[in-house]
Amino acid sequence: MSELTTVARPYAKAAFEFAVEAKAIDSWLVQLTFAAEVAKDETIKGFLSSGASVEQAQTLFLNVCGEQVDSQGQNFLKVMAINERLLVLPQVLEQFIALKADFDQEVSVDVTSAVEVTAEQKTTLSAALEKRLARKVKLNCFVDASIVSGLVIKAGDMVIDGSIKGKLNRLATTLQS
């Protein structure tokens, strides 16, 4: 099995790098999942193992995949067919999923402040957020004088509003109720 993983690794890496560049990681994951299921089918495995020509294997595989795989995915499968590697698609999928998991460990955090955040503050903030989120943090800093003072931190669904503007808005809401 480790030999198949070794064979699959460069294909998975190439597919993942392309998917990242094209901002289509989820689309590629769906396509590779479908193609891996096709490669696991006993009839397809039998045909590919029977000594079919590269052209026959490529044609059959692309016909079975049909519109489930876009043109870039088809090109990827053609390369795998030419190199007689279609049967390692399940391992390519496993490697792709592992690369995606590593990739997703980074979270993009938007930090808005009334004044520019210093390099020292960025370092301290990054360390604190990495500890809290248990992920590598990429800070995107913005300046918005309307928040008066403090910070507004947004990471995915999480929002920490430590701005004076936010505190005043919460106070106004409390006083109105």
UniProtKB/Swiss-Prot annotation:
Keywords: ATP synthesis, Cell inner membrane, Cell membrane, CF(1), Hydrogen ion transport, Ion transport, Membrane, Transport. The keyword Amino-acid biosynthesis does not apply. Transmembrane segments: none annotated. It is found in: Cell inner membrane. Signal peptide: none annotated. Pfam families: OSCP. It comes from the Bacteria. The keyword Translocase does not apply. GO terms for molecular function: proton-transporting ATP synthase activity, rotational mechanism. Disulfide bonds: none annotated. It is a peripheral membrane protein. GO terms for cellular component: plasma membrane; proton-transporting ATP synthase complex. InterPro entries: ATP_synth_OSCP/delta_N_sf, ATPase_OSCP/d_CS, ATPase_OSCP/dsu. Belongs to the ATPase delta chain family. F(1)F(0) ATP synthase produces ATP from ADP in the presence of a proton or sodium gradient. F-type ATPases consist of two structural domains, F(1) containing the extramembraneous catalytic core and F(0) containing the membrane proton channel, linked together by a central stalk and a peripheral stalk. During catalysis, ATP synthesis in the catalytic domain of F(1) is coupled via a rotary mechanism of the central stalk subunits to proton translocation. F-type ATPases have 2 components, F(1) - the catalytic core - and F(0) - the membrane proton channel. F(1) has five subunits: alpha(3), beta(3), gamma(1), delta(1), epsilon(1). F(0) has three main subunits: a(1), b(2) and c(10-14). The alpha and beta chains form an alternating ring which encloses part of the gamma chain. F(1) is attached to F(0) by a central stalk formed by the gamma and epsilon chains, while a peripheral stalk is formed by the delta and b chains. NCBIfam families: ATP_synt_delta, PRK05758.2-2, PRK05758.2-5. This is ATP synthase subunit delta. The lineage of its organism: Bacteria, Pseudomonadati, Pseudomonadota, Gammaproteobacteria, Alteromonadales. The gene is atpH.
